[in-house]
């Protein structure tokens, strides 16, 4: 179910403050965040965000195509190690 338009997109306040500070200073630092549910806005474009996946921080470089998506979509939480191979010679 989509979020109401009158409410606007969810963005963590601490993350928005950090992005605004970096945009004003012009530096290109990596920002660590645990806020996987924050929506990517146009202010984020061109920055690298380290998104926590429950184990470690995954660096995500934000491009224009990512605007409107959530940060958690680009930091997978589960690792797929493959299905077990059947042994044909088993008797």
From Swiss-Prot:
Disulfide bonds: none annotated. GO terms for cellular component: cytoplasm; small ribosomal subunit. Keywords: Ribonucleoprotein, Ribosomal protein, RNA-binding, rRNA-binding. The keyword Transferase does not apply. SUPFAM superfamilies: Ribosomal protein S19. The keyword Ribonucleoprotein applies. It holds the Pfam family Ribosomal_S19. InterPro entries: Ribosomal_uS19 (IPR002222), Ribosomal_uS19_bac-type (IPR005732), Ribosomal_uS19_CS (IPR020934), Ribosomal_uS19_SF (IPR023575). Transmembrane segments: none annotated. One of its GO terms (molecular function) is rRNA binding. GO terms for biological process: ribosomal small subunit assembly; translation. HAMAP family: Ribosomal_uS19. Belongs to the universal ribosomal protein uS19 family. Protein S19 forms a complex with S13 that binds strongly to the 16S ribosomal RNA. This is Small ribosomal subunit protein uS19. It comes from Amoebophilus asiaticus (strain 5a2). The gene is rpsS.
């Amino acid at each position: 179910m989509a979020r109401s338009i009158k409410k606007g997109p969810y963005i963590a306040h601490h993350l928005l403050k950090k992005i605004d500070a970096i945009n004003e200073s012009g530096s290109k630092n990596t920002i660590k965040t645990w806020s996987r549910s924050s929506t990517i806005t146009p202010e984020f474009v061109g920055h690298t965000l380290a998104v926590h996946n429950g184990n470690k921080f995954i660096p995500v470089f934000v491009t224009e195509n990512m605007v409107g998506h959530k940060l958690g979509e680009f930091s997978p939480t589960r690792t797929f190690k493959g299905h077990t191979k059947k042994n044909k010679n088993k008797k």
